[in-house]
Structure formats: C-alpha cells, structure tokens
A protein has these predicted regions:
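Bacterial N-terminal signal peptides that target proteins for export
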Residues: 1-13
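Short stretches within intrinsically disordered, low-complexity N-terminal or propeptide regions
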Residues: 6, 20, 24-27
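Intrinsic disorder/low-structure terminal segments
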Residues: 12-15, 313, 318, 332, ...
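N-terminal mature-domain region immediately after signal-peptide cleavage
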Residues: 26-266, 273-279, 285-308, 335-474
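A cross-kingdom feature marking charged/low-complexity
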Residues: 294-329
Length: 474
C-alpha cells in the first residue's frame, strides 16, 4: 500500500509508534494449538487449522500471534500514511459498518483469532483483527468513497493498488490438456515479506482449503487457493476502480466463503457476488479440475461480466477488460496506454500464451511469473512492466497506483498448480521475488531516504526456492 512521502511523515510516525502493540519474539518455527500446528518450509510458515469456526480462529491466533501483531503494525503505518486516518478510525469502521454484514460463522472465527492472540499475551481485540482483514478494502476503497461523499477538504489522493500477474489455461493451450493456474502477488515489500503463510484449513463445515495468505486474515487476500471440490482460484486487482456499497458484505468474507463452500464455477461466482460491496474489486480466474472448464469473472460493483472456456486461457494483470466496467467502474483507466504496467504486462501475457500454446505446464508457469520481459521498451529488465515486478528499480514508479519513484513494491511471491496437483490438494509456492532476486531493506533505505517512514516495518525479503505443499502435510 505504498504512497509518496508527505510532509506529515514525522507526525504519522509518532502516531504509529503510539498505537503499535508490543510485538514479542516470533513463535517457535514448529508449534501446536489443539488440532492446529505450524512449521517452516522454503521460506513459508505452513499452518494447519481444523475444527469449528471458534477452534479454527483460536488456533490461527495462537499459532501466529506475534506474526499477527507484526502485520497489524504494518497495516497501521501504511494506512495512516496513505489516508491520514488513524487506527481508531479503522477499528470503529470495522465495528459499526463491517461487523453487521459478516456471517456469524466468520464473526466466530475472527473472535477466535483475537482470543488466540490474547492467549499469548498480545493486546489486540476483535476490532483490530477485523480492521486487519479489511486492510485493503477500507483504506483503498471505502476511504476514497467516503472522502468524496463528505467532500473532505485537503483529502489525500488515494488510488487502489494493482496487485498481481496471473493466468489460467486449459485444453489445447496446456500440456496434456490440464488446467494450469499461476499467480504472483504484487504488494509493498513491507507486506510481501510477511505474506508468506500457507494455510491448510479443514473446517467443520464446507470444503478443505489450501491457500496462501497473511497472518491474521481469514482469506487468502492475494487469492491463490484450491479446495477439495476441485476448484482452483486466483485473481488480480482492477486498476483505478471506483465504488463502494456500505450495506454490502466485506470482500474478505465473500472470498473466503466462496472457496470454502463452492463446488463449481457457478457456485463460486454466486457466492462471491452475493452482497458485493465493491471492496477490493478483482478479476477472478476460476478453474474446475473436474470438468476442465475455466472462467474469468470481472467483479466490478456496477458490472460483473463472466467469460468461460473449456479450451483456451485467461490472462490478468490489473487491467479492466469489459467495456461497461471501464465506463462505469474504472472511468479513469486507459486501456490504450501501453506504457502503463497493467497494459504492458497484458501484452506480454498474450504473447506468451500464443507462443507456448500446447506446451504450458507447471514448470513453464513458474518461468512466466518470474519473467522480466518489458513489452513496451522491448528489453529484458526487471521493472514496473515485467510480469515479475520490481518497482524499486525504476524512477517511473506506477502513477496509476500512486506508487512513487523507486517505491519498494513489486512481485513478492509466486504460486502455481495444475489440475493433477489440485486433485491431491497440492501447489508449489515461491517466497520473495519469483525471479530469485533478494531485497535488502537497509541498502534500499540508504539509497532512498525518502522512504524513511517505512523504516519501522521494511525488512529484508529473501527469495526462497520453489517449494511443494499439500494439505495435511506435517
């Protein structure tokens, strides 16, 4: 959630330090809580959660207590800097606007997370946990809508950040006709260095889930996962989206519910559209390993077009696709600006799909999301237009997301699966830049003191190896 440095950096830093909870040393690499457990592998923390919503939540909070407190610290600083609103505002919004629209099951799970964290001596409550879960949709979607509605004077210019490069393919485009799905998460490096949890969730009701995620968050959030009904999902954010429905259901609830309860593409689409609040508006790539069908749901607020195929592909890199979405949901988005990150990456994706038709598999997908091809400059260089993004290396930044020159953000993880792996509830994941480059925080801050406000939360982001995970792993 990067933003350019403002004159209020010092006061915001003071505000951050006043509200940040004490964060104890990280929990042991391996630990248990009831039926839940955790271990470290390949730069990821694998967390198994099992049982009722309360049990799943408590295990989550207890096993990741220090990581959750740390993640809250990140979202507090980033959101305060970007929106000029303090954590009290987000806690109160979580309580008064979001909570009444959260299903009872997930209210219980969120409460359980808070209790689990508290059991380890950390002073966070359920409103901190809900605000953390809404750490994208409140600052980047609700606050711009609220500022406009209230005609707020001197309101900061807030733009939803683009997140991710992804594709899904099937039929004649893939080796053996399998569904292949791949995704890399684009975020601030402060978030990305911590977005390294593999959640194996076996709920008392619904489907078993294997997904990546953030500490304390009940959904994948960058959204890559599989369930035991054969669904394979991912998404990328829609650039320059505008809109919010205060009576809608939070996106973090709808996306978790869809992966937990959907057994088909139709069911997934119905669940994630139900109560759509416009928060964290995404293009959803959905596959069904049972049928070989894939789908692309452009989930705007006013428009929600759906495309489907049993022999083809869908690529996504934060661009709006549908003309009505562009007209009514993303009126500032310019699809003809090929120098823009989202459009340049789309050109690269289309080229790769055409060039590699019939050969796409997991190994090739790993190479795709580690790629440094720049379709606009016609060079191979890690930058804001490469599928594996490195915005910290370029003066241009990404204006469409309000990422300034050399902003410390880009591709922070990679995940890939095919339908054969999904049948075994398995995936492969790469922590850090998928290309293998490490990010060194001290070196970056020395070169770019304008981002000194991030010093309390910016840390090294080492690139781990591609690592296989499966449900029930110990």
């Amino acid at each position: 959630m990067g933003r350019a440095v403002s004159r209020g950096v010092v006061s915001l830093f003071s505000l951050f330090m006043a509200v940040v909870p004490a964060v104890p040393a990280h929990a042991a690499p391996s630990a248990t809580s009831g039926a839940g457990y955790r271990f470290v592998k390949g730069g990821w923390i694998y967390v198994h959660l099992e049982g009722t919503p309360e049990q799943v939540g408590f295990q989550h909070g207890a096993l990741l207590s220090s990581e959750i407190a740390d993640m809250v610290s990140v979202i507090k600083l980033e959101s305060a800097h970007a929106t000029k609103r303090d954590w009290r505002f987000y806690r109160e919004t979580a309580r008064t606007m979001l909570w009444p629209h959260i299903d009872a099951e997930y209210q219980q799970e969120l409460t359980g997370i808070a209790k689990g964290v508290q059991s380890k001596g950390i002073k966070l409550d359920v409103w901190d946990i809900v605000a953390l879960n809404a750490g994208i949709e409140l600052p980047q979607y609700y606050v711009p809508w609220l500022n406009k509605r209230e005609k707020a004077l001197n309101a900061p210019h807030i733009l939803p950040e683009g997140r991710c490069s992804a594709f899904i393919a099937t039929g004649s485009y893939t080796k053996g006709g399998k569904v292949v799905i791949a995704h890399n998460n684009w975020s601030s490096y402060a978030e990305g260095a911590r977005w390294t949890i593999i959640f194996d969730v076996a709920p008392a009701k619904g489907h078993h889930i294997l997904m990546d995620g953030e500490p304390g968050v009940i959904t994948s959030q960058d959204d890559f996962g599989v369930n035991d009904a054969g669904l394979m999902i991912t998404e990328t954010t829609i650039t320059q989206f505008e809109g919010w429905d205060p009576e809608g259901k939070p996106e973090f609830v709808r996306s978790r519910k869809a992966l937990q309860y959907a057994g088909s593409i139709n069911e997934y689409v119905a669940i994630i559209k139900d109560g759509n609040n416009g928060g964290y508006a995404n293009d959803w790539l959905i596959g069904d390993r049972k049928t070989g069908e894939i789908a692309y749901l452009e989930l705007g607020l006013k428009n929600t077009p759906l495309w489907r195929s049993k022999d083809g592909y869908f690529v996504s890199s934060n661009f709006a696709r549908d003309p009505m979405v562009m007209k009514e949901d993303t009126p500032e988005f310019n699809p003809n600006n090929l120098a823009a990150s989202e459009n340049a990456r789309r050109v690269t994706w289309e080229s790769k799909m055409a060039d590699e038709k019939g050969r796409i598999d997991v190994e090739m997908a790993e190479q795709f999301i580690a790629d440094h091809e720049d379709s606009y400059s016609h060079k191979v260089e890690a930058d804001e237009r490469s599928l594996c993004g490195h915005v910290d290396k370029v003066k241009a930044g990404i204006p469409e997301w309000n990422w300034g020159p050399y902003y410390p953000g880009g591709a922070v993880t990679g995940k890939v699966a095919d339908s054969e792996m999904a049948a075994k509830m398995a995936l492969v994941a790469h922590a850090g830049h998928p290309c293998g480059d490490d990010f060194h925080a001290a070196e970056f801050l020395s070169a770019h003191p304008e981002y000194g406000y991030l010093r309390p939360i910016l840390k090294d982001m080492p690139a781990g190896p591609w690592t296989a995970f499966r449900a029930g792993e110990k």
